[in-house]
């Protein structure tokens, strides 16, 4: 596989990291090779915290940044961005992708974590998923809350094609997005535990706005891990560790990370 250098301090959404070698997946055979070498897929690094010492990283090449109308369904490559998916669905009056207005990332990452907002999740759009070069029905995978259960490299997906883009729903998601912090962020740091909210739990133990170095939990939304300027990987990891400890001691709830930590 070809490789190139990515500076995660510039590339990742939280702007933390260092220049690291990343392998390019250009074919299904490359995907299988990456798996055999235990490589981690970085996508657009929107929900990743990457150590300066991380190794065995890979990403989909631009060959997988495509979208095509196949008549009864839309096929989208794993490297295609959420913003472009949203724009296509809106301009072609297709329903279901309104929530992507507020979610950054690539198709592969969205499917991998079954991304969503409120009651809307990517699984509701999916017909089939191409994993390691093999198409499988969406029902083949668990597709749980923020975890698809997919083990492998997501090369593409097929979306149901339904008419009726909902402009009112888009407006709701735009309003939600306004409550998100403006600083570099990895998005939601922790998954919401059943029957509760991670942000509420973090706020209840005094961590809203709390900083270690330049890593902080946002004043706007406690579950957003942000970079106030020069945060390091160690700052962010220490803050996550502290948060899990405080919440567990106060409530007995073991918070599960939504951000993926690559060490």
Curated annotation (Swiss-Prot):
Active site per the UniProt annotation: 146, 188, 258
Task: Tell me which EC number(s) this protein carries.
Answer: 1.3.1.98
- Keyword tags: Cell cycle, Cell division, Cell shape, Cell wall biogenesis/degradation, Cytoplasm, FAD, Flavoprotein, NADP, Oxidoreductase, Peptidoglycan synthesis
Q: Which family does it belong to?
A: Belongs to the MurB family.
Q: Which domain of life is it from?
A: Bacteria
**Under what name is this protein listed?**
UDP-N-acetylenolpyruvoylglucosamine reductase
Q: What does this protein do?
A: Cell wall formation.
């Amino acid at each position: 596989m070809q490789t190139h250098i990515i500076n995660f301090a510039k590339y990742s959404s939280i702007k933390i990291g260092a220049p690291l070698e990343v392998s390019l997946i250009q074919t299904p055979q490359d995907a299988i090779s990456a798996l055999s070498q235990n490589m981690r897929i970085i996508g657009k690094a929107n929900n990743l915290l990457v150590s300066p010492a991380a190794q065995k990283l890979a990403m989909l090449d631009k060959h997988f940044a495509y979208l095509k109308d196949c008549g009864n369904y839309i096929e989208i490559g794993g490297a295609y961005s959420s913003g472009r998916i949203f724009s296509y669905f809106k301009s072609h009056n297709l329903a279901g992708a309104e929530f992507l207005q507020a979610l950054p990332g690539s198709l592969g990452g969205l499917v991998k974590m079954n991304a969503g907002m409120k009651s809307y999740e990517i699984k509701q759009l999916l017909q089939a998923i191409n994993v390691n070069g093999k198409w499988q029905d969406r029902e083949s995978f668990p597709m749980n809350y923020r975890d698809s259960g997919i083990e492998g490299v997501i090369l593409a997906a097929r979306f149901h094609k339904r008419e009726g883009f909902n402009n009112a729903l888009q407006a709701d998601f735009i309003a939600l997005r306004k409550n998100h912090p403006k600083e570099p962020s990895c998005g939601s740091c922790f998954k919401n535990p059943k029957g509760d909210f991670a942000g509420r739990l973090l706020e209840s133990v005094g961590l809203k706005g709390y900083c270690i170095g330049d890593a902080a939990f946002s004043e706007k939304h406690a579950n957003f891990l942000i970079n106030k300027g020069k945060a390091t990987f160690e700052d962010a990891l220490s803050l996550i560790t502290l948060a899990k400890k405080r919440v567990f001691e106060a409530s007995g709830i073991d918070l599960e990370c939504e951000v993926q930590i690559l060490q």
